[in-house]
């Protein structure tokens, strides 16, 4: 369960379209502490960490999540609130 307290912020570094889904690479000071399959709140949306590479981690949002949240507007440089 998330506390609602933002732990840190990240920056969208890369956006990859996969059909109607989007994959995001997020750079943050806590990325190297994350683990694959860990749930992390990204600006209020709970997403599963798919890969960690140094100070970056990868997540994917499906089309419905992109429609019902602000993730559809994320682009490189967008700030992301992170909560574990």
Named regions from a protein language model:
Residues 1-84:
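Conserved loop->alpha-helix
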